Amino acid sequence: AGARQTSFYQRDPWKRLIRTLSLQNSVTFGTIKEADESANRINKLHEVIKGEDEVTGKIYDALDHDQLLWVHACLQVSSIFFFEKTVRKLSENEKDMYHKENMLSAKLVLIDENKMPQTHKELENWVIDLTRRKQFLLITDVANDVKSIIQTGPVPRHIKPIWPFISFMAFHTLPEEFRNLYGVNQKKWHKKVVNINLSILRITRPFLPPFFRLIPPARWAKQRIKNRPDLQFKQKSKI
């Protein structure tokens, strides 16, 4: 409903994605000042996103705590899932360490740490329980729009050749509940292709140079920690 209200994702989905990633990366990899500024900007944007959902008739509010926590939790669970599929398995202690560190960014976007699950496993179970709740997940016009955008790929020309593969992997790494919702019929050969490609990433990654192993904001943050303490995210980012 919030996406329908802004509708920016329809006018320029790629620009919307880049802007969202830029703000998120600034919170994660920027200086303390930059993280605070980006979080404040996110919070300001969220202040005006509220109303009545046309599909369910329920009230939505981008500053509602449960809705904020849902987005945060899905991002965290997805991040750890992808890391374990393409890098290595994490111990429960490592996952909890990430969870505790991630709570800092959650607080910046107005999520109450005292109302959050206190371990990664608890957070993951919270997400799973909600997805299995009847009528919690619905396919709406907005969800179908996003599905179409991912399938057709209105992306820069240099990315277009690999976009069908990215789209395929995006849909076929979704949890079963989400695949069913989007009508993604995963056959055995689909699963094989996914597993083979994830295995290739996991095997080859250690041998790749940092340019390919790390996203740019992570490399810039590493530079700042090692020898450039004054380096700011906005100085390097062209987003």
Task: Please tell me what each predicted stretch does.
Residues 1-239:
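Mature, function-bearing regions of proteins
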